Design a protein with these regions (language model features):
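Distinct, well-ordered alpha-helical segments
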Residues: 98-105, 127-132
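Conserved acidic-Pro-Pro-aromatic motif
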Residues: 37-40, 54-61, 111-118, 122-215
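Juxtamembrane luminal stem/stalk of type II transmembrane Golgi/ER carbohydrate-processing enzymes
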Residues: 1-7
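SAM cofactor-binding core of SAM-dependent methyltransferases
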Residues: 8-103, 118, 145-148
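Hydrophobic transmembrane signal anchors and adjacent membrane-proximal interface regions, especially
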Residues: 7-8, 133
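Hydrophobic, Leu/Ile/Phe/Ala-enriched alpha-helical segments that form helix-helix packing faces
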Residues: 28, 104-107, 172, 176
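Helix N-cap/coil-helix junction residues
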Residues: 33, 109-110
Length: 215
């Protein structure tokens, strides 16, 4: 099945914004993953527009990271009812105490955990690029979908912009991942797992879903 057809067939929102809940559920089903670990930041209360909270409701363990103190307090209310490890920190894209590798090392999450969702509206690209130790099976990363797929645009500020499709795709390849589909976010799977998905496309850089989020 072509990935855009896959998106429109399985797209479903329970907590997510652009159909990721249904898409991720089907991808994990094809990967034979029915439980495990997820990580998401900035998580806010862990529920609102989350790409992974539906999995938490289904029994997955989670590490949710939120830097804003008020929003972190909202997250703590969610933690009381679920298997969530909360972290109050802003993830740094440099090799510091608050790098994603260092923050995750203080938790029980395994190196090859199941789903990573990166959605911080700025240096998402740099955070994933800086992740060296942990190798999640699926990566969901927000991009600037208004940038043409052939433009090499990398956001280098904390403004709510995001990096374009092309450099994010290239980063995934560099890190050993295969691009699966675009929902407004880009979803990647580790190379050795892609064959299980039964998803195809002709040219990844042309596989930008112009109708993402029902647009």
């Amino acid at each position: 099945m072509y990935s855009n057809l896959f998106y429109h067939k399985y797209s479903k929102n329970i907590h997510s914004q652009n159909g990721e809940d249904g898409v991720i559920e089907e991808l994990l089903k094809r990967l034979d993953i029915s439980g495990g670990w997820v990580c998401e930041f900035g998580a806010w209360d862990g529920i609102y527009l989350s790409n992974t909270f539906r999995l938490v409701e289904q029994g997955f363990n989670a590490v949710f990271i939120e830097g804003d103190v008020t929003r972190y307090n909202d997250l703590l209310k969610t933690v009381e009812k679920h298997n969530i490890t909360p972290i109050n920190a802003y993830v740094d894209h440099n090799d510091t105490e608050n790098s994603l590798d260092n923050l995750l090392s203080k938790t029980a999450i395994p190196v090859d955990f199941d789903v990573l969702s990166i959605d911080i509206d700025s240096y998402d690209y740099q955070v994933w690029k800086g992740l060296k130790v942990y190798q999640p099976k699926l990566v969901i990363i927000e991009i600037n979908s208004s940038v043409n797929t052939n433009v090499e645009y990398i956001n280098d500020s904390v403004k709510c912009m995001g990096t374009g499709f092309k450099p994010t795709y290239e980063l995934g390849v560099e890190k050993g991942y295969t691009f699966v589909l675009h929902t407004g976010n880009m979803i990647f799977v580790r190379n050795e797992l892609f064959h299980k998905l039964n998803i195809r496309y002709d040219n990844p850089l042309e596989n930008f879903n112009t109708n993402w989020g029902g647009r």
